[in-house]
């Protein structure tokens, strides 16, 4: 049926729309839809006739256009010209008719007065018409072809693309692209060839016009071909060439027809052009002498006449072969975030590995998708970005050459454009001109490039955005990105590579590369292109093996694969070559770290490069030159230097010894032979890899500081012209190489170098102190330093100077110092010094005098204990934390800035929660109180008292009028917020209350308890109306479903139960867990339940059926906490394995493992918008994670020093303690002084033990290692690695030849002290091993575990001899009696059990503690047993009677460790209150209290500059003082 629509009415309706409306895209789309519906046009399915499509197009195109233009399209003559042009496959008819019409009528004058490009508007109208026509099918047709997109959105996108097209040729190219697709409404009988002919004609016309060729009036259009005549300028005249376009294959008959047309039209030449291919006969025919005026081309071959890329192709091929990428490339994996198109939040992640063809496979798909135009490839340094770029360019080049050889349509030509050499403020025209003209001598102007780009002929690859972006500030970087984005136009494909760590904040980097941050100038008009981001993954083991096998023998590869340090370094592709180069030194037993691998490799490379007959034949001179050149490149952001510029630099660096031309010639040849700088054909030198520059700069800094380690100094000592008879002396870096000629004209002879000494401050200010050190340089610099004193003297040299005189010298030196030794500055007088931008995090600054020092921009430790609980405010702007120090803190979510510190609790804060209006926060603590805090001021509004034991959980009612608290006193209390009164005490539970939860309307409260029940309480009556029974162990977690109809509970009985609220019945018992369930949580839609616990598995359950949908695995320790994202698509959890994991619910895949915590993760919370995740850990940090990128936005770090373990040395004169501050301390008993502090662990020290003769000490840590320390030297003798989780306990065997360690990885390892080898791994426990101990005769080993068992192992056979059962909670400590007849065990069930070794029976159960028993020890004579508990007491028991002799009070927090002196007269106890107490065993009295000083104890900050008052207050809390306080 024909669509009869009055165009006058359409124009009237369209022009009546107010202009402001059309500026908003959404409003414009809504307006268009309403107008279409007004004229009975279906917005999704246009009518299938010409008139209907024409009217539809007038609405889509016309909204916001001047009325005069719409009047033009209303004219019948224009409408008929449009129909004729399309029916005859000749779009140029329309443009010609429009010109004629405008010349002949007054409307033309009105339109021209608007100063708009008429032809452009006509072409834009035609483009919209084609797109509408493509959709003019039935809904069934549309669905069948899966064309489910919204039409008006698609057209809006096309119109926005057209707004980005600056030229008519660009619009013609876009029309050609659309015309290449069939559009049935236009020409129902049109063939595929006709559509191709239209596309070819449009591209050719655009190409000819871009080249400046004039088209004559002559045009022929037929079903299989079209003909034009073009005028090609030749000197002062032009050639007339007849062009015949053929959509299909050019055959011999086409050549004959061309010849006939050329003769008829009397042109100079004739060209046949095809999109497809040309037959052999046709090519042979035009080669004949009589046809020398004829030629035939594919369209690509036609382009070759004026765009010659052959020189570039030769360069690209040579560059790839030089890099050996064609031979040694190993496929790389990548990840890509999946973004919700509506919320713009990340909802998942895709990993592209072998099954998907790696990153190559994704880029192939991206190239084939016409909607995608730009992609950024991110990766850390050395992960293979440039490697991949040249590999993919090589792959694309082979495809291109193959198509070129076969004479078929070619794929895109890859153009690799490196950004390292361009100016700080980019101009894309200059970048392209530099690439085409300067680098590759390709004579293309910008118009020709633009046309090739729009026609889809190019693949643009910009490599190294980070190397350019690092030169500028944030806004200029954004401007530069958008400047490059100018080449992103319809039809283009652009790849950009960039270092991940370039961006100071991962979130900002993502936002920029996803085109979310706008430029301050040169913005793109209209809708931005579609941008994507991929991120390269580091090598896995198999990839490492593969790349090594390309370069080394199997035995060498296995040697590297077997070395964990080398394997970790080799995860970056850039390091594999260096490792192989350095292998001889590694095999010789030299130390291994990243800097030394560079050192060994660089030395071998330089030795190979040196030729004896050349001037620069010493390692030292070459090293100096490369260091200075690297510094110049990095500091000036000039990543390449032409050889012509080197003579001046050589003269400047080496003085008069190279003034003669022959010396420079020697240097020139020497440079051409070396391998660390790559020279191109133009003589430009660039580093083989940026990290080499960073290594040489780090070396230069270490030498200038006078702190270079001896093995690094050896390269500098390899100098020529030395007087070997003279004693070696110290030189400055610059002085050593400033050699002059002696009186005879020979290079002066100097004394050998002993070591480098520090440069003067003025010199350091221009190099080392020019800017804050980057992470890459710091990481390479630290292993090079072996002397603290020069750095200290440099800091002291800043005394009395101004900030401008020092720059970052003092701050950089201080940062390096404290990273090497966290205690090195203790007691130093640094008054009046200038220390700008230092990082003092977790550094001991005890008794440092900073009086009147300038500490601007320096970072210090915050006060923060183990973070036990985290909660976001309802608006997501704040989050709150509660920690083991009893402190509640408020933080700004956007910046990580600490806003308020709320003090009042005097013990652990276990739970925090915001009120619904976000104005208040409640906190529950081990101090038996609940506190209510004002969010705006941080003031404590009320303190709710009444509980008689720790408060484990607090929660506001939905209306925020009441607060519920659950406690270990077996009660739940309901508090009135306004009055502070306790409304009800819910009694009935006979065990600790672990969890409380309100239902949705606040009418009910559920509680889970250690008495194995769940209770449901009616708030109005305070009565318990249901007791849910069925669990057979304590209930740790309860939660209501979102509709309030069900309740879920997780228990230590290894089950989850679903309860029906209305009936009180158990709907399902969800079984599958093999250990206690710690956390349960419903998905936001209530369809699923997640559960996690000690079996290291998360299970997802279907609520309707009770079936386990799937299990999420990969954990190596307990799952402590679970939370769904607000949209329900992601599940986050915290674990005792120190990792936060994010799971995609739909794919069941782990999206991210968020690593960085060095202790258990106690709490995780999503922000209300789901964009940020906060995690709190026992490592005394809160980390904020960006969900979209998985990057850590902020680390909020603090400090406490719980004492986890104490032990006396064999003679009882010394006590060792292990602490949560990552240190081991030795204390002298008589003086109570701390003798020394052992540093090296990177997390809590959980256990310490002396060997039998007291010469060594072993320590086990949450960093998964055991360290062996020499008491006399305080040095670490060895680090035992192998455990995959915390090391909780260490023990020597009686003769000291072996060491046992128990770990959270559920194993016990036996180590040989002499060889440092692991002799045996004992397996059998199903949860953490908390304690290990040897029998007195050394034949057996006992272990206690969180699986509630004690196991007895045979040392000789490794077999488990016996398993002791009876405890009902974890076993935290085991110890043999001195005679070996009894084994004692302390447990979380609050008891100590004594077991008979001979019978395996329990002799006594010692009861009396009212909290966990974590540590036990026998007296030396075996008559007494001491036990330390979380109830803050130590108990002394008589072994023979089982009687408690004393209860020792004094600690104000959990007691973690107890130890007897060798004579049995003194008992030591270590506590979370940060003290060690010494007790008289006979009287039970406390003799002494040992307490380590606070981290900033006695630090004098009188009149210090550069710190805020809040920062000063924090420092004072950590021990700092001002004069008035001294």
Curated annotation (Swiss-Prot):
Highest taxon of the lineage: Bacteria
Domain Pentapeptide repeat positions: 823-862
PROSITE patterns attached to this UniProt entry: NACHT, WD_REPEATS_1, WD_REPEATS_2, WD_REPEATS_REGION
Tagged with keyword Repeat: yes
SMART domains, A to Z: WD40
Per-repeat ranges for WD: 334-376, 862-901, 904-945, 946-985, 988-1027, 1030-1069, 1072-1111, 1114-1153, 1156-1195, 1198-1237, 1240-1279, 1282-1321, 1324-1363, 1366-1405, 1408-1447, 1450-1491
Keywords: Repeat, WD repeat
Protein name, entry field: Uncharacterized WD repeat-containing protein alr3466
